[in-house]
């Protein structure tokens, strides 16, 4: 499970934007995204698909709904999308809501 906080290119949650006061969180997500690319290359010849998924700003902490967090069920859709990719689906990418996010 990744986060837009681990992206240089995500205009909403990217490293240079939202989490600048808590950089460790974004840096750990950036490392996870790098591991995603490495493992996707390692398993390229297999049917295993390895992707990072950002569920978006999701209400997993009490009170975050008032900050505009989406319901957990909405965030889960991104995870299910990635888990159910067909054999010819993408691998080594970073996605939210089934759409690619820039690294």
Where are these regions (language model features)?
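Structural signature of the Rossmann-like NAD(P)-dependent dehydrogenase/reductase core
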Residues: 1-3, 49-54
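Catalytic loop of short-chain dehydrogenase/reductase
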Residues: 1-44, 64
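C-terminal helical subdomain
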Residues: 30, 45, 52-55, 60, ...
